[in-house]
Amino acid sequence: MKKKYYISISLLMTIIVLVFDQVSKWLITISMKVGDSYEIIPNFLNITSHRNNGAAWGILSGKMLFFYIITIIILIVLVIFYIKEAQFNLFMQVAISLLFAGALGNFIDRVLHGEVVDFIDTNIFGYDFPIFNIADSSLTIGVIFVIIALIKDAIINKKEV
């Protein structure tokens, strides 16, 4: 019988992402100055110490109150979505846990430091992508998983009609 909620898996996923996110950011802040960069994979991956007080690409830079309010709303909405829409669906619960962990990881940075620590610096197919962190990766993967889960549900529901 399928469980309604996989709370232990969801909590474990959230905690693992948060720990990796916060520890990696702490290591960057104690070992690198802002702007320092180390090439890991030539022309593809650098570790670059960067701070961001906005969103991706510096959008809404300095609008901390906005980010505090929006993040709290998003975290509440994610909990409600988890309870109401993710019942019996482990994949959706993992997706929401990734979203929650990513949002919370960057929220912690904003509250404690007034900015987010970014350090993953990639060059993908010649495009110098904005520098990001593990929380951002968790958010991106969570969004992709939610889309996959919604498409899968739509296909299953269409077959049942």
UniProtKB/Swiss-Prot annotation:
It is an enzyme of class 3 (hydrolase). It comes from Staphylococcus epidermidis (strain ATCC 12228 / FDA PCI 1200). Belongs to the peptidase A8 family. GO terms for cellular component: plasma membrane. This is Lipoprotein signal peptidase. The gene is lspA. Pathway: Protein modification; lipoprotein biosynthesis (signal peptide cleavage). GO terms for molecular function: aspartic-type endopeptidase activity. Keywords: Aspartyl protease, Cell membrane, Hydrolase, Membrane, Protease, Transmembrane, Transmembrane helix. The active site is at residues 118, 136. It comes from the Bacteria. Its EC number is 3.4.23.36. InterPro entries: Peptidase_A8. It is a multi-pass membrane protein. One of its GO terms (biological process) is proteolysis. It catalyses: Release of signal peptides from bacterial membrane prolipoproteins. Hydrolyzes -Xaa-Yaa-Zaa-|-(S,diacylglyceryl)Cys-, in which Xaa is hydrophobic (preferably Leu), and Yaa (Ala or Ser) and Zaa (Gly or Ala) have small, neutral side chains. It is found in: Cell membrane. This protein specifically catalyzes the removal of signal peptides from prolipoproteins. The chain crosses the membrane at residues 9-29, 63-83, 88-108, 131-151. Disulfide bonds: none annotated.
